Design a protein with these regions (language model features):
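A short beta-loop-alpha structural element at the N-terminal edge
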Residues: 4-17
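A short acidic/small-residue loop/turn micro-motif
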Residues: 68-70
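Short coil/loop residues immediately preceding or within conserved phosphate-binding loops
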Residues: 49, 76, 112
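Conserved acetyl-CoA-binding loop-helix of GNAT-fold acetyltransferases
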Residues: 86, 92-105, 117
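Conserved active-site alpha-helix within GNAT-family acetyltransferase domains
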Residues: 109-113, 118-142
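Conserved acetyl-CoA binding element of GNAT-fold acetyltransferases
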Residues: 75-88
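C-terminal "cap" of GNAT-fold acetyltransferases
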Residues: 116, 137-166
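Active-site rim helix/loop that mediates acceptor-substrate recognition in acyltransferases
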Residues: 18, 25-56, 61-65
Length: 166
């Protein structure tokens, strides 16, 4: 594979990002077809704390977003990772891992206390994520809702993402 460039998104990237997200989730049995719309709504609301793209040969082929979450309706410096998207022809080549690692590093530089996500435990455990019974995302199987604390204790309570998630 050619050189990979990970960078912050630019305003001019939004159409390409939407295309990448749509392609990435097109055949995903857990996707609902709204992933690109969710990112766009968060962008319009200035709610994307971190939004990174992965480029190969100056073409955007991956994207990741991080946004604030609340625990028991209070923002306590925890963030949600959602979504991470890689164009299908570039999947399974380490781009998702690179985006996740870079995003988590940037969150820590922002003095975040932790990050949550909804995803496959077998994939995300390599980054340190694990289910934690103290954090609850209603109507979701507990083993798929995972947390990563950046050093402190994990809070307890009901987690809410940005309203764009529905």
């Amino acid at each position: 594979m050619s050189k990979i460039n990970i960078r912050n998104e630019k305003k001019s990237d939004s159409t390409c990002i939407s295309e990448v997200i749509t392609l990435a989730f097109k055949d995903d049995p857990h996707g609902d077809g709204r992933e690109a719309e969710i990112v766009e709504l968060m962008r319009e609301d200035s709610a994307l704390t971190i939004s990174l793209v992965a480029e190969v040969d100056n073409k955007i082929v991956g994207h990741i977003a991080f946004s604030k979450v609340t625990v028991n309706d209070e923002f306590i410096d925890w963030y949600g990772l959602a979504p991470v998207s890689i164009t299908p022809s570039y999947q399974s080549q380490g781009l998702g891992s690179r985006l996740i690692e870079e995003g988590l590093k940037l969150l820590q530089q922002l003095n975040a206390k932790g990050c949550v996500l909804l995803g496959e435990p077998d994939y995300y455990q390599r980054f340190g994520f694990a289910a934690d019974e103290k954090l609850i995302l209603p109507a979701v199987p507990a083993e798929y809702f995972q947390a990563l604390s950046f050093g402190g204790s994990t809070p307890g309570g009901i987690v809410k993402y940005h309203p764009a998630f529905g």
